[in-house]
Amino acid sequence: MFQALAKASAALGPRAAGWVRTMASHQLLVAPPKALLKPLSIPTRLLLGPGPSNLPPRTMAAGGLQMLGHMHKETYQIMDEIKEGIQYVFQTRNPLTLVISGSGHCALEAALINVLEPGDSFLVGVNGIWGQRAADIGERLGARVHPMTKDPGGHYTLQEVEEGLAQHKPVLLFLTHGESSSGVLQPLDGFGELCHRYKCLLLVDSVASLGGAPLYMDQQGIDILYSGSQKVLNAPPGTSLLSFSDTAKNKIYSRKTKPSSFYLDVKYLANLWGCDGQPRMYHHTTPVVSLYSLREGLALLSEQGLENSWRKHREAAAYLHGRLQALGLRLFVKDPALRLPTVTTVAVPTGYDWRDIVSYLIERFGIEITGGLGPSTGKVLRIGLMGCNATRENVDLVTEALREALQHCPKKKL
């Protein structure tokens, strides 16, 4: 073997001699994983949890298209079309509208990293896990975080928020439009105007609500809005949508310190996404194939129309609510006007372990629902109807599966 390597080294020349010598003096100590020598196998699942949701055929097909270079003109054209799609689904004319190469958490972090500076006052509506996450990130950035904490299922009134604005004089308020951990739909009308009266920016999480409930970024005075790809848009997780008002942009561009993240620096991302009128420069390699799928998800929602999508989700949720109540289950959010159409929460029925019910549905029927998350853990079951999954047929499937689960899962005697 060594003679063969020596001959190979001589034949390839001095530049190749180094790696030939390296191969001769080292051994592979880690074998190829046996699991990777088998074909990939994916089970069939009906994803009726809080996300991700199933992919429609058009979105799946987009994910199988051939790769383009991330700086090709055709890729930039796709990015421009995505930006227009975001402006439509957000109902905004903001030029600073783009995609973050990362999940909804990444968009939240991008918003906070670019807007907040050390010492800034940050008012956070914490009525579920997403407010908790926003407060956590704010603390890491050195902001003075002021949580307005409510139990799962709670929401915020204009009066409550105004009291917080007057007391803490924040530069930024965070609210979750669709709190998927508790199933609450937070009203937004009037909050933007209220924030601006106190010289405060309004940041809204619409990951679970976008496309499923009415949302008007410009008309509702929302300064920063973000969402995800894997809910109503029915695209793979891993990309997120983000838009900034001119007021928010001015705050970012006039900050005294650099944002703590290069990857999430909006000034660079604005150039990458063609938002600053300058020739595009390399910043990072975008997930090109994921952008294909996101583009198709936005296209499907655009073809359907926002108002039709909102109506579809409202009707599917109402049908689900009726079927659940017919089973004797209690909806966690009492006020119908505050129920998130895309994610319904049900109080865990007395005597049952929520994990038994979730496991029964996935193992017996291949249907995913989930338990609570963060503060709602152990309190609720969560059922999602998003995008192509928001149908009466799926409601019938999941409620019949729940009926059987309640008959077969162990129940403690009280």
UniProtKB/Swiss-Prot annotation:
Subunit structure: Homodimer.
Disulphide-bonded residues: none
Gene3D superfamilies: Aspartate Aminotransferase, domain 1 (3.90.1150.10), Type I PLP-dependent aspartate aminotransferase-like (Major domain) (3.40.640.10)
Binding site for substrate: R382
GO molecular-function term, one example from the UniProt record: alanine-glyoxylate transaminase activity
Entry GO terms, CC: mitochondrial matrix; peroxisome
GO BP term, pick one: glycine biosynthetic process, by transamination of glyoxylate
Positions of modified residues (N6-(pyridoxal phosphate)lysine): K231
Cofactor: pyridoxal 5'-phosphate
Keyword check for Transport: no
Protein name: Alanine--glyoxylate aminotransferase
UniProt key word Transferase: yes
Residues the record lists as N6-acetyllysine modifications: K256, K334
EC number annotated for this UniProt entry: 2.6.1.44, 2.6.1.51
Protein family (similarity comment): Belongs to the class-V pyridoxal-phosphate-dependent aminotransferase family.
Segment annotated as transit peptide: 1-23
Key words, A-Z: Acetylation, Aminotransferase, Mitochondrion, Peroxisome, Pyridoxal phosphate, Transferase, Transit peptide
